[in-house]
């Protein structure tokens, strides 16, 4: 994803991918350019629903909360953020459960980033999300 400086301002969201609501997330890895002009950028990784092009946070920090990993370039094996905020006891839990829902809404939910504090630097963000559906 090519991000403009204005895409990483405080309260901005960036959707990564739609995931079947009944899938279990195995890994969320981020690879990125330095997206911070200083040392202020923080973001959450969470679950969102979508209706008519509008995204709503179900749990905006289900996987990661206030991470600082986008402050410097990350290549190689990337940064695994799957369990930064998520308890390892939830391994195998479905995305709808990660989102705090009481039942499976069906369809797709989205994995997205919410920028808590601005980085305001343009750059690229790549990701790998591995999941299983049983």
Predicted regions and their residues:
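Surface-exposed, low-hydrophobicity beta-strand/loop segments enriched in small/polar/acidic residues
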Residues: 1-134
